[in-house]
Amino acid sequence: MYVNGRILRILKFKKDGFRQQNFLYPLLLQEYIYSLAHDHNFNSFFFYKPVEIFGYDNKSSLVLVKRLITRMYQQNSLISSVNYSNQKGFWGHKNFFFSNFYSQMVSEGFGVILEIPFSSQLVSSLEEKKIPKSQNLRSIHSIFPFLEDKFLHLNYVSDLLIPHPIHLEILVQILQCWIKDVPSLHLLRLLFHEYHYFNSLITSKKSIYAFSRIKKRFLWFLYNSYVYECEYLFHFLRKQSSYLRSTSSGVFLERTHFYVKIEHLIVVCCNSFHRILCFLKDPFMHYVRYQGKAILASKGTLILMKKWKFHLVNFWQSYLHFWSQPYRIHIKQLYNYSFSFLGYFSSVLENHLVVRNQMLENSFLINIMTKKLDTIAPVISLIGSLSKAQFCTVLGHPISKPIWTDLSDSDILDRFCRICRNLCRYHSGSSKKKVLYRIKYILRFSCARTLARKHKSTVRTFMRRLGSGLLEEFFMEEEVLSLIFLQKIPFPLHGSHRDRIWYLDIIHINDLVDHS
């Protein structure tokens, strides 16, 4: 979780009674909370024009926040505005627009407040375990060296999908374990109702586009807390079923409500719970997750993996009330199966090498088997993403980008080169470089078609007039930081470079749709 330095300084100097009793609701009336939310997340059109809309010099004054919370609780005005908006259209009624703006503004500030107890406990746990922040590898590519080191000795792999909550009240119950402030929980339920109501009401493409541009810090926090609840069950079973202490499970905070459920489970099942844990013992169990997809690999047998699947699904559904679909959890043998994870198709390849050894007059053959984790960039999904972003057709034929023809030539070149560089950089760990060459070819000629369309010319005439040096940035070599040797080595995207390179500065996967 991202730790805000200014929030921690606020906690250090704020010694109010509500903070000591975990009362978060009064923080909603503090102006600096909304300035923090504005600095971090609000980069949309809502906060570029709030002064003209509301007529306030301060965008989030104390009086405004009080009025926002008061009007959110007035259900009659909301219902009347909805009925009127159905007649006049969505943008025809200001009260309806403002009511959504109220909930959006308060929810983002509420998201900043909810992170305060989590951030303080996370920092204290890091200080107790003496874990330097510089040693926390945030790069996504740092996962692949871990897979190369561990997965070569495993037998089975199971790809999981994080189950879906069957009701929004489950999210409130998750946060109820951490927050003892009743008004904050009531406000949380109200925000859930607002989001559910607006999502079901807004159906036009313009409205969806407008509200989808908002970066919802509040919703990201809820999703992370929900995923943490799902993962905590796995780590609890893993810790209880192993004699050894887990060394790669990361940092997890203390929970109380979960142990109450486990105690109730032990009372119901009597001694069968410990018998179940005995059947789940496996010292070579590895778990990796990114967003909503996870990989569970083991050196055990197929029966052991099926037991883990059975107990995880039943615990999720029976005791945590999470809806899970068992048929979507696939268990495959690692040597005969390629799993999709983090934009790669990964599999373990076996290479056999026959060596002839001769001792005196006797000679014999030695069969040496080596294993290697093979990662391949999925060409079909990449072309599908480029097709959705209108860079090519479904078959991979480059097309022009009409919405970029109003930009300058330098901006068009910069956008195409940046997308090409990001894609080739992220998929630099692919063992088959032909996929990168094809992606680069699509973006290069899509850029040429876009420039030719802007200047009302053909691609051949345009390229002949300006020369081949126009698109030379697509072929420029890039200096990369080697993961093994801390030195810079040239990485030619167009050359015969066969080695896989993992970067240490890629912290998220960029969606191509965001560039359009």
From Swiss-Prot:
The gene is matK. One of its GO terms (cellular component) is chloroplast. InterPro entries: Domain_X (IPR024937), Maturase_MatK (IPR002866), Maturase_MatK_N (IPR024942). One of its GO terms (molecular function) is RNA binding. It is found in: Plastid, Chloroplast. Pfam families: Intron_maturas2, MatK_N. Usually encoded in the trnK tRNA gene intron. Probably assists in splicing its own and other chloroplast group II introns. The keyword RNA-binding applies. Belongs to the intron maturase 2 family. MatK subfamily. GO terms for biological process: mRNA processing; RNA splicing; tRNA processing. It comes from Cypripedium calceolus (Yellow lady's slipper). Keywords: Chloroplast, mRNA processing, Plastid, RNA-binding, tRNA processing. The keyword Chloroplast applies. Its main location: plastid. This is Maturase K. HAMAP family: MatK.
